[in-house]
Each structure stands twice: as structure tokens, then as C-alpha cells.
UniProtKB/Swiss-Prot annotation:
Chain positions of ARM repeats: 178-228, 229-273, 274-323, 325-363, 364-417
Bias (Basic and acidic residues) ranges: 34-45
Post-translational modification Phosphoserine, affected residues: 389, 545
Tissue-wise expression: Widely expressed with highest levels in skeletal muscle, placenta, heart, spleen, testis and thyroid.
N6-acetyllysine carried by residues: 91
Annotated positions of the N-acetylmethionine modification: 1
Source organism phylogeny: Eukaryota, Metazoa, Chordata, Craniata, Vertebrata
Subunit structure: Component of the PRP19-CDC5L splicing complex composed of a core complex comprising a homotetramer of PRPF19, CDC5L, PLRG1 and BCAS2, and at least three less stably associated proteins CTNNBL1, CWC15 and HSPA8. Interacts directly with CWC15 and CDC5L in the complex. Interacts with AICDA; the interaction is important for the antibody diversification activity of AICDA. Interacts with PRPF31 (via its NLS). Interacts (via its N-terminal NLS) with KPNA1 and KPNA2.
Name of this protein: Beta-catenin-like protein 1
Residue span of region Disordered: 1-49
Length: 563
């Protein structure tokens, strides 16, 4: 209730039900006194309301006056007050350290100084509202002192420091003053903040709420710093953070917010970072990720938060598979078998497992995984997904386009990498049941060709408008248009056309005839397919070397000669 509600509140006292023999008498009395009573009641009511209004005004005046006094008492935060605060902090920190050394076995002697130290650390939170003054924390060595306290014998003090650092590094605050933020982050990195934070993490007991909060705030510091300065991720991972995250993920503890946060930070550390991906592989991290994900092969996550953690772990695994050495570890760790099982079980994890398989098989580095996938009867799993996109796919946030993109990419990788008997087994799938899989391939071809024609028409219109306005269409603009076309469906269409070229070059007349027959029926032509494949070859990346790109382009264009 606000002040007005408090003053106007009247409790419901209820009414007394009259006995039968009193009813008539009361009716007569009411008739006689009704008019007089109503008049008197209105007068009394007005008096009560006026008194209540007066009380309300007086109370509001007192509250306003107290608020003004509090505002007057608050000292404005400026350079001088921050310096004074830092000096007090340094004095209390030194005093506590001195008393702990002097009376190591007598906590009563240093306990008061510890409380004083904790109080000043709490007061320093106000500095987080003024990032322009962060330079004072560095110039007066407060940052170094705070980092030193991360190893304090009393974890309450180290947790208080973590809480303060988390607020100082809040990403919104850092962006308020780039200069102040740079100075602070430089000092933290120079002081090896991540190594000190990890040492503190090692001794925290998450069964104690305050210490569990300390773990959460520590992870927040890492996330804030990684977002502001992504290059510190490599150094941070090497200072023990990556190892601690893996240990925390595999710890036999119930799922909680900290485990979710660990999965988020892990995904951040691995993003576009080959050094961290290699380090994770060396720390047996691929096995840890597979073990954690194996829980979801037959069971769906029980909460939205647990599903988010699962997706973070899948993202981390996909990121690691960008590195060829990790694909070997994935193969040895029976990752293919786990993903194949997830595809068969039809749980929420299925769409993410499909994405992992795509990453594991792509390019020449995926050759061993492609052969193993056929050996474990993976073709029986992947082709039903090719023939029909799952109905309930929207519930897990994966679009039909994404599903078809991954399936077509996997088939393209299999056709590229398989040799001998396994390749024959794959090609035979396209002749089964009156070439139904060729029919499905052509159905997808026309679906995405139509989407591309719509996108191309829109882009051509935009180009025409730019020329009319006298704007130059440079390489950057062309690249932007190309990326838009890929997103609109060109990426899937390129894989579909590549699959068509591969299977038509396989010396299986039945397949080639069916492809040409359907193209003619739909009024399309080989020229369109050739053009799409040529564009695909021209835009292949360097991969590991320019030589790889050149050889791959020759191989793909060679498929067109017999198409």
C-alpha cells in the first residue's frame, strides 16, 4: 500500500444479524430516525475525511522533508571522494593483513578489521556508476589490491571483491566510457585476473548460497571482459579457465544456473578461436561434451534452461569440429554413434545432432567420419530425414530450411568423400523405390530455385535503383548481395545442384534419365543447374590453402563435363 491507501484503509467489521422478534421494532426506529441519522452521518463522514486528509498531508510533508535531508547528506561522487574512498580501502586492507599476520590463531583480534574491510568494499560499488573515474582505481593501485584480495583466507572477502569486479565490468557500464573501460581492462589483464579468479573458484563450495553466487559473478566477469575484448579469451582459457569449466560441467551435481552459465562461457571461449578449440581437444573436452550430451539421447531437457544448456554444448561441439584434429577425437569418442542414435530417437536433440554431423563430415577432413557413418548404418537414418522434414521441428526453434540445409550438406559431403563399396551403397539409395529419392531431390531443387528467383528479382530492383541514384555498386556491396542470396536459399540450392551433378556422373543411367526427365517436364534446363554450380565453384573459400581451392574448383567444374 502507498501512503494514501494506508490512511484511507478501513477494516470490514461486518454486520450483526438481528433476531426475528427485534426486526419489527428496528424497522419502526429506522423510519423515525432515518432522515436525521443520514444527515448526521454525512456530517461525521465529512469531518473524518477532512481529518484523514490533514493526517495524509502531514505524513507526506514528513516523508518529503526526510527525503530532502537524505539527499543533502549524500556526498556527491567526484574525483576527491573516490580518492578518499580508495585511501580508506587501502588502509583497512593493510590493517587486516597486519592483524592476520600478528594473530593468525586468534580470529577475535582481526575479525573487526575484516568487517571494516568488507564494508569499504561494499561502499566502492558506487564507483561503478562513474566509469570516467576508473583511471583512479588503476593509478592508485586499487585494482592490484583488489586482485590480491581474491586470494584472501576469508572467502567472504574474496566473494565481495568478485561482486565488485562484476559490477565494475558490467558491459553497459564499460560502454559508457570507452577510455575508462580500456584502462580498467588493461590493468585486470596485466594482473592476470582470470588466473586469480580460477584459483578462487577452486576453493568455493557451491552448496553455500553466497559461494554459489560468487561462482556466478565470476563467470559474469569473464563474459563481460570477453565481450569487451574478445582477444583475451585465448589468454583466459590458458590460465586454467577452460579446464575449470570442463571440470564443472562433468561434476556430478544437479543442473543449476551455474552449469548453464558454464556452458555459455565455454561457447564464447570457443567461438572463432582455433587455439582454444585445440586446447579443449587436448584436455579431453570432446569426450566431456559427448558425455554431457548423451543424457539427451533418450530424454528431452526438463526445463527451458536445461534446453538452453544443451544447445550451448552442441554449439561448442560444432565449433570444435572446425578443427581437423578434433574430428579424429570425435570419431574415436564414438560421437557419430551418439548423433546417429539421437536422430533415430526423435527427441529435441535431433536437429542439433544433425548440425553436428554436418560439421563432422564436411570437406576432405571429414572423409574418415563419412566412411564410419556408412559403416554404422547412418544412411538408414539420414535418408528418411531427407525424404520428409519432421513435423514438430518448429517446437525446437529449427526451421524447415535449416533442416533441409543440413541434410543436403551431409549428402553432398558423403558424395564428395566416399569411395569404393560405401559410395556404391550411397548411390544405390537413389535408385530404390523407383528413384523416389531423385524425385525428392528435384522437388527441393524447384522449391529453392523459386525462392532464389524471387530474391534475385528483388536484388536486381535494388541495384537498378542504386544506379539510377548514381550510387556505385562496389565489391563490398556485391558481397553483401551474395550473402543475402545465400541466406534466401542459394546455399541449399548449391548443395542440391552439386548432388545432382555427382549422381549424374556416377554411370547409373537410371538416375541421369530421371533427372533430365523431370527438368524437361518442369520446363527447366541443365543450363540453370550448370550456372548455379559454376557460381558455387567460384565462391569456394581457400580452406587450408589456395591450392585446395584450385583443386576443388577443378573437381567441381569437371562434374559439369558429363552432366
Amino acid at each position: 500500500m502507498d501512503v494514501g491507501e494506508l490512511l484511507s484503509y478501513q477494516p470490514n467489521r461486518g454486520t450483526k444479524r438481528p433476531r426475528d422478534d427485534e426486526e419489527e421494532e428496528q424497522k419502526m426506529r429506522r423510519k423515525q430516525t432515518g432522515t436525521r441519522e443520514r444527515g448526521r452521518y454525512r456530517e461525521e463522514e465529512m469531518t473524518v475525511v477532512e481529518e484523514a486528509d490533514d493526517d495524509k498531508k502531514r505524513l507526506l510533508q514528513i516523508i518529503d522533508r526526510d527525503g530532502e535531508e537524505e539527499e543533502e547528506e549524500e556526498e556527491p561522487l567526484d574525483e576527491s571522494s573516490v580518492k578518499k574512498m580508495i585511501l580508506t580501502f587501502e588502509k583497512r586492507s593493510y590493517k587486516n593483513q597486519e592483524l592476520r599476520i600478528k594473530f593468525p590463531d586468534n580470529p577475535e583480534k582481526f575479525m573487526e578489521s575484516e568487517l571494516d574491510l568488507n564494508d569499504i568494499i561494499q561502499e566502492m560499488h558506487v564507483v561503478a556508476t562513474m566509469p570516467d573515474l576508473y583511471h583512479l582505481l588503476v593509478e592508485l593501485n586499487a585494482v592490484q589490491s583488489l586482485l590480491g584480495l581474491l586470494g584472501h583466507d576469508n572467502t567472504d572477502v574474496s566473494i565481495a571483491v568478485v561482486d565488485l569486479l562484476q559490477e565494475l565490468t558490467d558491459i553497459d557500464t564499460l560502454h559508457e566510457s570507452e577510455e575508462g573501460a580500456e584502462v580498467l581492462i588493461d590493468a585486470l589483464v596485466d594482473g592476470q585476473v582470470v588466473a586469480l579468479l580460477v584459483q578462487n573458484l577452486e576453493r568455493l563450495d557451491e552448496s553455500v548460497k553466497e559461494e554459489a553466487d560468487g561462482v556466478h559473478n565470476t563467470l559474469a566477469i569473464v563474459e563481460n571482459m570477453a565481450e569487451f575484448r574478445p582477444e583475451m579469451c585465448t589468454e583466459g582459457a590458458q590460465q586454467g579457465l577452460l579446464q575449470w569449466l570442463l571440470k564443472r560441467l562433468k561434476a556430478k551435481m544437479p543442473f543449476d544456473a551455474n552449469k548453464l552459465y558454464c556452458s555459455e562461457v565455454l561457447a564464447i571461449l570457443l567461438q572463432d578461436n582455433d587455439e582454444n578449440r585445440e586446447l579443449l581437444g587436448e584436455l579431453d573436452g570432446i569426450d566431456v561434451l559427448l558425455q554431457q550430451l548423451s543424457v539427451f539421447k533418450r530424454h528431452n531437457p526438463s526445463t527451458a534452461e536445461e534446453q538452453e544448456m544443451m544447445e550451448n554444448l552442441f554449439d561448442s561441439l560444432c565449433s570444435c569440429l572446425m578443427l581437423s584434429s578434433n574430428r579424429e577425437r570425435f570419431l574415436k569418442g564414438e560421437g557419430l554413434q551418439l548423433m546417429n542414435l539421437m536422430l533415430r530417437e526423435k527427441k529435441i536433440s535431433r536437429s542439433s545432432a544433425l548440425k553436428v554431423l554436418d560439421h563432422a563430415m564436411i570437406g576432405p577432413e571429414g572423409t574418415d567420419n563419412c566412411h564410419k557413418f556408412v559403416d554404422i548404418l547412418g544412411l538408414r537414418t539420414i535418408f528418411p530425414l531427407f525424404m520428409k522434414s519432421p513435423r514438430k521441428i518448429k517446437k525446437v526453434g529449427t526451421t524447415e530450411k535449416e533442416h533441409e540445409e543440413h541434410v543436403c550438406s551431409i549428402l553432398a559431403s558423403l558424395l564428395r568423400n566416399l569411395r569404393g563399396q560405401q559410395r556404391t551403397r550411397l548411390l544405390n539409395k537413389f535408385t530404390e523405390n523407383d528413384s523416389e529419392k531423385v524425385d525428392r531431390l528435384m522437388e527441393l531443387h524447384f522449391k529453392y530455385l523459386g525462392a532464389m528467383q524471387v530474391a534475385d528479382k528483388k536484388i536486381e530492383g535494388e541495384k537498378h535503383d542504386m544506379v539510377r541514384r548514381g550510387e556505385i555498386i562496389d565489391n563490398d556491396t556485391e558481397e553483401e548481395f551474395y550473402l543475402r542470396r545465400l541466406d534466401a536459399g542459394l546455399f541449399v540450392l548449391q548443395h542440391i545442384c552439386y548432388i545432382m551433378a555427382e549422381i549424374c556422373n556416377a554411370n547409373v543411367p537410371q538416375i541421369r534419365q530421371r533427372v533430365h526427365q523431370i527438368l524437361n517436364m518442369r520446363g527447366s534446363s541443365i543450363k540453370i543447374v550448370r550456372h548455379i554450380i559454376k557460381e558455387y565453384a567460384e565462391n569456394i573459400g581457400d580452406g587450408r590453402s589456395p591450392e585446395f581451392r584450385e583443386n576443388e574448383q577443378k573437381r567441381i567444374l569437371g562434374l559439369l563435363e558429363n552432366f
